[in-house]
Design a protein with these regions (language model features):
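Active-site acidic/histidine clusters and adjacent loop/turn architecture
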Residues: 1-43
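Catalytic cores and adjacent binding grooves of peptidoglycan-active enzymes
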Residues: 67-164
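An exposed tryptophan-centered "aromatic clamp" motif
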Residues: 64
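Extended, low-complexity, intrinsically disordered C-terminal regulatory tails
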Residues: 29-61, 111
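Residue-identity detector for glutamine
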Residues: 8-12, 35, 42, 51, ...
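N-terminal-biased segments
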Residues: 1-3, 20, 43-46, 50-58, ...
Length: 164
């Protein structure tokens, strides 16, 4: 995707997010861009039918998630985004995954690179993020380009709670 289209897409997708979450995602994007990376928000808000389809095809483990959150009158208030490396959208390098996780954590967000990892492997990933170690022996969770809000559960978000 050309640079102008990538930036326009990111700005449009940020409007699908809850404002405080969007500001954090924007900061993550800026951090990665400062390192010469071209992050692209692939998905922010996702409709319930699209979420069910993702669940049914094994791309999600939940039928309702942070991507599906809405506010008053059904306004999109996503609390998750899938942030791809625009130069490697189908096969993100380990370096990108580790740098994305570090930037997400630095801005109070939770990276999907931890999803599905037992505690014993989470420690190794945390150390890799801290040390910016891109070693292929480090295990990565099942949704490495996903980042989401912290401090609330999916059920709380569905019931109307939002991050502060």
């Amino acid at each position: 995707m050309n640079e102008a289209d990538r930036k326009q897409r990111n700005q449009q997708r940020l409007t699908e997010c809850f404002p405080k979450f969007a500001a954090r995602v924007d900061a993550v994007i800026k951090d990665l861009e400062a390192q010469g990376i071209r992050p692209r928000i692939q998905d922010a808000h996702r409709s319930i039918p699209d979420q069910i389809d993702a669940f049914n095809h094994g791309f999600s483990k939940v039928r309702f998630g942070f991507h599906n959150v809405t506010g008053a009158n059904g306004k999109a208030e996503s609390l998750a985004v899938d942030l791809l490396d625009d130069d490697h959208p189908l096969d993100p390098p380990r370096k990108y995954i580790i740098l994305l996780a570090g930037a997400a954590q630095a801005h109070g967000l939770h990276p999907g690179s931890f999803f599905g990892l037992p505690q014993s492997l989470r420690a190794g990933l945390s150390k890799a993020i801290q040390d910016q170690n891109f070693d292929p022996k480090i295990k990565i969770g099942f949704d490495p380009t996903h980042i989401e809000a912290t401090g609330l559960s999916i059920a709380e978000a569905k019931a109307g709670k939002r991050p502060t």
